[in-house]
């Protein structure tokens, strides 16, 4: 059940692989921690969900991961200035919760790729009905499926989608967790075994889901799937209501 729903969300976003998590916060944490470790640095938009802001700036700081926040409409020069030698990811939200500021995905992606790191975008608010961040350059997309995807306040959940576009082996020195043998999983090297299309999600499942257990229950995945069936009908109606207000 979980695999079917994850595959459906991957198809909606135009990705190559996906996984479900127990919540949107779990999805964001996994997406970042899958490529960051003690001593890593993250560049993040400052206009993001408060829970995610605290996750990155407070909780992950206790793990030895630091962050530099930038405005969602920062210039290329301002973005460049935020990077360090140990930067491993760039993060932002398509439309921020609750500020509703819009991220310049193309620019953030351009700068992230210039520095050899992926752009992770939380696409909860627009959903792939209104925006597909991968088409604008994002490498990893996350969701709190609790919101519009479920649509009925019935099931908490999250999702991570990999675009399959980021070449981990081309930046092997930055991402040893993906490009060197995993001693906890029979010495497998994810980027070699699964390629850029499947390495990120496979590692996230085999390592983080195994160790942290933030899995979405099959019953919640079943409920989420029901919500996805009407997503294409509900989102235009939400937009109509917003425009009327």
Predicted regions and their residues:
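Conserved PLP-binding active-site segment in aminotransferase class I/II-type PLP enzymes
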Residues: 1-11
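Portal/gating segments that form or line small-molecule/metal binding sites
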Residues: 14
């Amino acid at each position: 059940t979980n695999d079917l729903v994850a595959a459906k969300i991957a198809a909606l976003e135009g990705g190559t692989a996906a996984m479900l998590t127990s919540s949107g916060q779990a999805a964001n944490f996994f997406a970042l921690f899958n490529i960051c470790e003690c001593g890593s640095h993250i560049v993040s938009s400052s206009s993001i969900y408060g829970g995610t802001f605290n996750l990155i700036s407070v909780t992950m700081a206790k793990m030895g991961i630091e962050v530099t926040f930038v405005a969602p409409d920062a210039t290329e020069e301002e973005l460049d200035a935020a990077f360090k030698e140990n930067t491993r990811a760039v993060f932002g939200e398509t439309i921020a919760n609750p500020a509703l500021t819009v991220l310049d995905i193309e620019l953030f992606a351009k700068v992230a790729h210039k520095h050899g790191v992926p752009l992770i975008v939380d696409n909860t608010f627009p959903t792939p009905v209104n925006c597909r961040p991968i088409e604008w350059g994002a490498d990893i997309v996350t969701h709190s499926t609790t919101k519009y995807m479920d649509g009925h306040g019935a099931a908490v959940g999250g999702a991570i989608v990999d675009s399959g576009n980021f070449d981990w082996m081309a930046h092997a020195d930055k991402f040893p967790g993906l490009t060197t043998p995993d001693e906890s999983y029979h010495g497998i090297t994810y980027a070699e075994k699964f390629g850029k299309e499947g390495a990120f999600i496979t590692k996230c499942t085999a390592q983080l889901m195994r160790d942290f257990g933030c899995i979405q229950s099959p019953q919640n995945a079943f409920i989420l799937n029901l919500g996805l069936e009407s997503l294409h009908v509900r989102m235009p109606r939400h937009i109509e209501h917003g425009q009327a207000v």
